[in-house]
From Swiss-Prot:
Homodimer. Fe cation binds at residues 93, 95. GO terms for biological process: negative regulation of DNA-templated transcription; regulation of secondary metabolite biosynthetic process. InterPro entries: FUR, Fur_C, WH-like_DNA-bd_sf, WH_DNA-bd_sf. It comes from the Bacteria. It comes from Synechococcus elongatus (strain ATCC 33912 / PCC 7942 / FACHB-805). Residues 91-147 are annotated as: Dimerization. One of its GO terms (molecular function) is zinc ion binding. This is Ferric uptake regulation protein. Acts as a global negative controlling element, employing Fe(2+) as a cofactor to bind the operator of the repressed genes. Regulates genes involved in iron scavenging or photosynthetic electron transport. Belongs to the Fur family. Residues 1-90 are annotated as: DNA-binding. GO terms for cellular component: cytoplasm.
Amino acid sequence: MTYTAASLKAELNERGWRLTPQREEILRVFQNLPAGEHLSAEDLYNHLLSRNSPISLSTIYRTLKLMARMGLLRELDLAEDHKHYELNQPLKHHHHLICVSCSKTIEFKSDSVLKIGAKTSEKEGYHLLDCQLTIHGVCPTCQRSLV
């Protein structure tokens, strides 16, 4: 589902929450991110500050968690000590290959992973919301520097 401010407002209202200007601004940032870009809470905070849209870091953390629980954002562990987020686009499933040395991240598609996720979910009676695979390794550049 592609979220607009109106659809986000409707879903938030349905769950007993409201669409605040801060939530709308955070949604807008993620909608305008270039493909393949992921933001941490701190990245988002700095981005908003640079645009003269100061939102407290605690509000950002709460909003990111809420939007991830709603399925609007994907929460990612990208080999760092904090989470990153990206817009969840169900029709654009992709996975991540991450270098544990330099944190270089490559996105890739795999229908096999999605099929396994769908089959396993169905077998266990789950409704599949998202299926993501994260592979951790050492990139060729970092391998050369280890030798």
